[in-house]
Amino acid sequence: MDLGINEISLGDTIGKATADEVRYDNKRIKPESNTRIILLNKPNGYITTVKDPLKRKTVMDLIDNNKRLFPVGRLDKDTTGLLLLTNDGELANRLMHPRNQIQRIYKVEIDKKFRAWEIKRMANKVYIGQKEWGKAEVVEQKQVKGRVTVLLRLYQGQKREVRRLMYRMKRKLFSLERIQFGPIALGKISRGRWRDLNA
């Protein structure tokens, strides 16, 4: 599928001089030299947290030498795909700040295609409950047998935003995977595996 956006390979380091840059307030976000950034392909069933009082499986269980690392944002327990972890709190805050408008690309499997008016509605805004509004751009949708694969581009990163949007749009959601964060693409890294982007 063509995302219509530039990607970088997993071997590229954030902060390296490339045409694709992550920016905040129109300034390039550049981590400190001692900053560690991990890209994890999160599997289903793992909690996105550093410690869980209920002793459930967390994303930290998947990473060796995870001292001082913490997730940049969250993915639900049942959501898979690209999750960044870092030891740089300032960098994490900049990456998550709504003003930064950093895109997230999700691949969702649903029961039926979106019609033109529904695509337009989601690109504007949809009330998703709790006095919050969600929005998403439909990059591409493709039907295979009884299911539809849709690529969605979001910028806000509200809690469970995609799931709440699908509920409001009356779509049955079969799977949800994040495949891109800013210019960083998930690529071919296996589920449950991770890569140090500073290497």
Across the structure, where does each feature detected by a protein language model lie?
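Basic, flexible Lys/Arg- and Gly-enriched helix-loop patches that mediate nucleic-acid binding at interfaces
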Residues: 1-199
